């Protein structure tokens, strides 16, 4: 499934989604450089919790320093973007090397999280909250 570039280095690609965020992850063998929207990973993701969420597929498969990642992400907030990056990295690892499939699938990294924001209904204050009710 993995393609190779001009130099013969294996390439993998994966698209991850979470809430309204979309991440396109390009992965190839390298030193472990991670770029998000042409910025360094640490300058883009500053919260430690979000960093661990985003890099959890690499930690789980013991490939943290073995691949270079180039990520394009848009939409949503920082939490949704971290989840989209996690989903995209997991799919890219699976496309690059299928021996990671069992580990990633058993931990739920290849499954898209279907939860989205519920729409506001008319006659209500928010999606489920009603206006204040007075009996008398």
Curated annotation (Swiss-Prot):
Keywords noted in UniProt: Ribonucleoprotein, Ribosomal protein
GO terms (BP aspect): translation
SUPFAM superfamilies named among the record's database cross-references: Ribosomal protein S5 domain 2-like (SSF54211)
Classification via Pfam families: Ribosomal_S9
PROSITE patterns named in the record: RIBOSOMAL_S9
S-adenosyl-L-methionine listed as a keyword: no
Segments forming a coiled coil: none
InterPro entries: Ribosomal_Su5_D2-typ_SF (IPR020568), Ribosomal_uS9 (IPR000754), Ribosomal_uS9_bac/plastid (IPR023035), Ribosomal_uS9_CS (IPR020574), Ribsml_uS5_D2-typ_fold_subgr (IPR014721)
GO molecular function, one term: RNA binding
Protein family: Belongs to the universal ribosomal protein uS9 family.
Designated name of the protein: Small ribosomal subunit protein uS9
Organism (species): Borrelia hermsii (strain HS1 / DAH)
């Amino acid at each position: 499934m993995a393609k190779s570039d001009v130099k013969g280095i294996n390439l993998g690609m994966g698209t991850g989604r979470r809430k309204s965020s979309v991440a396109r992850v390009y992965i190839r063998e390298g030193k472990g450089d991670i770029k998000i929207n042409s910025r360094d990973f640490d300058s883009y993701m500053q919260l430690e919790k979000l960093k661990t969420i985003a890099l959890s597929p690499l930690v789980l498969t013991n490939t943290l320093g073995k691949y270079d990642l180039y990520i394009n992400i848009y939409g949503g907030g920082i939490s949704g973007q971290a989840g989209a990056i996690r989903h995209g990295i997991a799919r890219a690892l699976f496309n690059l090397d299928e021996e990671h499939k069992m580990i990633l699938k058993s931990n739920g990294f290849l499954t898209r999280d279907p939860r989205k924001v519920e729409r506001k209904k008319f006659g209500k204050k928010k999606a489920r909250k009603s206006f204040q009710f007075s009996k008398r």
